[in-house]
From Swiss-Prot:
Species, as recorded: Bradyrhizobium diazoefficiens (strain JCM 10833 / BCRC 13528 / IAM 13628 / NBRC 14792 / USDA 110)
Family statement: Belongs to the UPF0337 (CsbD) family.
One Pfam family linked to the record: CsbD
Protein's UniProt name: UPF0337 protein bsl1473
Superkingdom, natural source: Bacteria
Length: 66
């Protein structure tokens, strides 16, 4: 999945993001607005993971999207 597609259609994908990362709040999802760096930053804050691990988690999530 190309990130540009997610960014342009964030409303379609944010539900999937919320399912994957339940600690993300609705305000987080609104703030992210499809920007990968915002998503990764929020995931680091909410889950206390290292940047590299969060990046891998997001890459893995992308592979599940169609």
């Amino acid at each position: 999945m190309d990130w540009n597609r997610i960014e342009g259609n964030w409303k379609q994908f944010k539900g999937s993001a919320k399912e994957k990362w339940a600690k993300l709040t609705d305000d987080d999802l609104k703030l992210i607005e499809g920007r990968r760096e915002q998503l990764e930053g929020r995931l680091q804050e909410r889950y206390g993971k290292a940047k590299d691990q969060v990046r891998q988690d997001v890459d893995d999530w992308l592979k599940t999207l169609h």
